[in-house]
Amino acid sequence: MAKRDYYEVLGVAKNASDEDLKKAYRKLAMKYHPDRNPDSKEAEEKFKEAKEAYEVLGDEQKRAAYDRYGHAGVDPNAAGMGGGMGGGMGGGMGGGMGGGFADAFGDIFGEIFGAGRRGGGGPQVYRGADLKYALEITLEQAASGFDTEIRVPSWENCDTCHGSGAKAGTSPKTCRTCGGSGAVRMQQGFFSVQQTCPTCHGTGKEITDPCPSCDGVGRTRRNKTLQVKIPAGIDDGMRIRSSGNGEPGINGGPPGDLYVEIHIKQHKIFQRDGDDLHCELTIPFTTAALGGELQVPTLGGKAEISIPEGTQSGKTFRLRAKGIRGVRGSYPGDLYCHVVVETPVRLSDEQKAILRQFEASLNDGGDRHSPQSKSWTDRVKEFFS
């Protein structure tokens, strides 16, 4: 899951002062502190998130890197991208092992085997951040699938400076600290360790005259419109991955991905269970007693169902293949209709008199008309005997 924007986490504007940041952090820390919420995992996560955001935005250098490159600019693991061992070794050790380890041992192996480092002569490359978008759809849309258009907030390259961060008519200058490599070397004992340049933060460039549209960041926050295909049968909580539609990479790095998370609205009639559907079938007590034909709703229209005489509440009727065909399913699920016998209300005196006559006729017939009631009465008598 992609990290939230640090300014959004603290609830402050991008131009917030140090004092505003401090106040916002203190407020959140007081609210979500584990001592105040000992049994809340959510509060613990929010406390950690606020702490992480303030540790970056409360530091002038880290904040500048974050404003320019987003999360990648303050991620210590991102520095390893673009490193690696080539030449006589023929293999790669970049990225996953981390910059410090790969750089230190890369120099040793280079001296022994004559291997040259690839990627060490240019600025650090960062993959763009992934984006997450929550999409709410209906059960009918989930069953049939559809194409839709969404607007996703994202950092995009500035249209004015085309991502350079420099004012029109100027260009970034080579970083004086690292000479344009985006990295500096530090001697630690026998090892020569390469680290991201603290001045240019891995870009290899310095901006002396920043672009007024993006304040030298090279990127602006805006909504981008994307087409998304929702497959038929998708279920609540599933995610659709749109490769390359996340935030753009930095220094030529690959873009991130977009993850669309599906949330299905509660339906007025149906409840979904996998590929099956369930609904309540409310019938009058006369139909339950005498039987009859009823029409029941399905996602594909109406269906006929036969109600046998003497149907009781709780009986379930199964309509095969009237459910949903799942994303990977070969056949649709079933529809289960659960009977609820409705007792009439607000009866007239005449209707009540008819029912009393009906009740008397049932009593004359003994227990054969109400076997379940007789069984329940016998169990109650046994309980109290």
From Swiss-Prot:
It comes from Bordetella pertussis (strain Tohama I / ATCC BAA-589 / NCTC 13251). NCBIfam families: DnaJ_bact (TIGR02349), PRK10767.1 (NF008035). Its cofactor is Zn(2+). Zn(2+) 1 binds at residues 158, 161, 211, 214. This is Chaperone protein DnaJ. InterPro entries: DnaJ, DnaJ_C, DnaJ_domain, DnaJ_domain_CS, HSP40/DnaJ_pept-bd, HSP_DnaJ_Cys-rich_dom, HSP_DnaJ_Cys-rich_dom_sf, J_dom_sf. The J domain is necessary and sufficient to stimulate DnaK ATPase activity. Zinc center 1 plays an important role in the autonomous, DnaK-independent chaperone activity of DnaJ. Zinc center 2 is essential for interaction with DnaK and for DnaJ activity. Keywords: Chaperone, Cytoplasm, DNA replication, Metal-binding, Repeat, Stress response, Zinc, Zinc-finger. The lineage of its organism: Bacteria, Pseudomonadati, Pseudomonadota, Betaproteobacteria, Burkholderiales. Zn(2+) 2 binds at residues 175, 178, 197, 200. Belongs to the DnaJ family.
